[in-house]
């Protein structure tokens, strides 16, 4: 027994120290496991501590290899095929206690006669982690934060019905989508023509008062659509707004992309980068110039924001953090998608009632050369083609969001339930109902 002691003391853990503390498993063959990569720390395999008397028949890697070589069995937990016990031996689970030192194969054999709901739940959690590529349902730093339990939609209503509040009204709110959570994020300086947007968003995010920012609502925010028209006429309609949203949502780092975004911010400890982008996008949507009183959003602005929201949907599905069930990201997606669906449904209502919101601002500015001319940038369409083109475009945009909402529902089902998960399920179902209602209205 004394001769075996040095060999046992030199034996390293099958899982790294970080995973062992959380009672998780990882692969020792890899230079760094997924959990350590998320936390941005190297894997450390210390010597396994063994206290108490060793078991009567300890199983080693060689014994396991011989057994698998003869019988060709598969381990019921790790599902490792026969002859590949070297990979299975890397998942040794060391439990500290009186004479408790066994492998996952021993644990599964012992648990066959006394299976409990807790053990089956643990197996299901490990299975879900292997299926979707994350180590634990509680791995997401958003779910571990205190704001996860106190989540609330912090978008206070405006003074009158149908008018969303200015970002300045959000300064006193709290929650994951509020400016207080985003106070540590720097907003870059935008070009001169985006001065109203930069000042408004910066005041909404940082809540600055004093010498840094002087409140001048008349100069910061355009007072009417005529001033917004001048900004549009300067080439801001699509390319300029694209630069503005990229500067606001990506901190001035260029085009939004899943690979570049996660490479620059692979796993942020403060907040998921996708959730941060969507929170800022919500503030951009609630800007007074986009939601005027007794008026509807411009059609070109609606189409552009729908494209931005669709790209964020795609980035979230490829984000490493959001793949581990970030409920905050799903909630923000529901909010932004609901805004776009409402705006598209307004267009469908106008078309059904014989009205439209396309020519109100561009009529007479650029008359078409003939009845088949369609000016996409200025949206000056022929009277006979305007309704049919708009109807086809709105149908396409609405149907494109249907599979996205189905994917969001599947991601939400991966959770263990709770108030936020139920709220997301309700929002997704409401958005789906609005899409079907708008499509039915277009068919009529």
Curated annotation (Swiss-Prot):
Keywords: DNA-binding, Metal-binding, Nucleus, Transcription, Transcription regulation, Zinc. PROSITE patterns: ZN2_CY6_FUNGAL_1, ZN2_CY6_FUNGAL_2. The keyword DNA-binding applies. It holds the Pfam family Zn_clus. Residues 76-89 have a biased composition (Polar residues). One of its GO terms (cellular component) is nucleus. It comes from the Eukaryota. Residues 16-43 bind DNA. Residues 49-89 are annotated as: Disordered. Residues 50-59 have a biased composition (Basic residues). GO terms for molecular function: DNA binding; DNA-binding transcription factor activity, RNA polymerase II-specific; zinc ion binding. It is found in: Nucleus. Coiled coil: none annotated. Gene clusters encoding host-selective toxins (HSTs) are localized on conditionally dispensable chromosomes (CDCs), also called supernumerary chromosomes, where they are present in multiple copies. The CDCs are not essential for saprophytic growth but controls host-selective pathogenicity. Transcription factor that regulates the expression of the gene clusters that mediate the biosynthesis of the host-selective toxins (HSTs) AK-toxins responsible for Japanese pear black spot disease by the Japanese pear pathotype. AK-toxins are esters of 9,10-epoxy 8-hydroxy 9-methyldecatrienoic acid (EDA). On cellular level, AK-toxins affect plasma membrane of susceptible cells and cause a sudden increase in loss of K(+) after a few minutes of toxin treatment. This is Transcription activator AKTR-3. It comes from Alternaria alternata (Alternaria rot fungus). The lineage of its organism: Eukaryota, Fungi, Dikarya, Ascomycota, Pezizomycotina.
């Amino acid at each position: 027994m004394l001769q075996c002691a040095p060999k046992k003391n030199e034996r390293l853990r099958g899982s790294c120290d970080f995973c062992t503390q959380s009672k998780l498993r990882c692969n020792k063959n890899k230079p760094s496991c997924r959990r350590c990569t998320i936390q941005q720390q190297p894997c450390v395999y210390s010597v396994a501590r063994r206290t108490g008397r060793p078991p009567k028949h300890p199983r080693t890697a060689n014994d396991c290899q011989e057994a698998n070589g003869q019988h060709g069995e598969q381990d019921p937990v790790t599902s490792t095929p026969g002859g590949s016990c070297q990979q299975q031996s890397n998942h040794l689970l060391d439990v500290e206690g009186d004479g408790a030192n066994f492998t996952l194969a021993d644990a599964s054999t012992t648990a066959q006669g006394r299976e409990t709901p807790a053990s089956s739940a643990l197996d299901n959690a490990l299975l879900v982690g292997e299926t979707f590529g994350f180590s634990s349902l509680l791995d997401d730093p958003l779910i571990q934060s205190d704001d996860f339990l106190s989540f609330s939609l912090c978008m206070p209503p405006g003074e009158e019905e149908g008018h969303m509040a200015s970002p300045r009204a959000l300064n006193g709110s709290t929650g994951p989508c509020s400016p207080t959570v985003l106070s540590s994020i720097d907003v870059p300086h935008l070009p001169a023509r985006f001065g109203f947007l930069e000042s408004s968003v910066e005041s909404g995010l940082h809540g600055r008062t004093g010498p840094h920012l002087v409140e001048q609502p008349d100069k910061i925010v355009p007072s009417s659509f005529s001033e917004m028209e001048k900004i549009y006429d300067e080439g801001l309609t699509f390319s300029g707004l694209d630069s503005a949203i990229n500067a606001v949502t990506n901190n001035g780092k260029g085009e939004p992309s899943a690979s570049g975004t996660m490479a620059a911010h692979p796993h942020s400890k403060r907040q998921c980068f996708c959730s941060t982008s969507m929170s800022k996008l919500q503030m951009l949507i609630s800007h007074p110039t986009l939601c005027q009183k007794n008026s509807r959003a411009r059609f070109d602005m609606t189409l552009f924001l729908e494209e931005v929201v669709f790209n964020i949907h795609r980035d979230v599905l490829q984000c490493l953090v959001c793949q581990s069930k970030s409920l905050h990201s799903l909630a923000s997606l529901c909010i932004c998608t609901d805004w776009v669906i409402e705006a598209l449904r307004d267009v469908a209502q106008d078309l059904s009632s014989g009205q439209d919101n396309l020519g109100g601002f561009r009529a007479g500015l650029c008359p078409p050369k003939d009845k088949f001319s369609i000016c996409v940038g200025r949206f000056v369409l022929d009277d006979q083609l305007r309704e049919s083109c708009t109807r086809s475009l709105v149908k396409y945009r609405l149907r494109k969001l249907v599979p996205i909402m189905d994917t969001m529902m599947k991601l939400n089902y991966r959770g263990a339930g709770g108030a936020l998960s139920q709220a997301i399920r309700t929002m997704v179902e409401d958005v789906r109902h609005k899409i079907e209602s708008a499509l039915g209205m277009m068919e009529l």
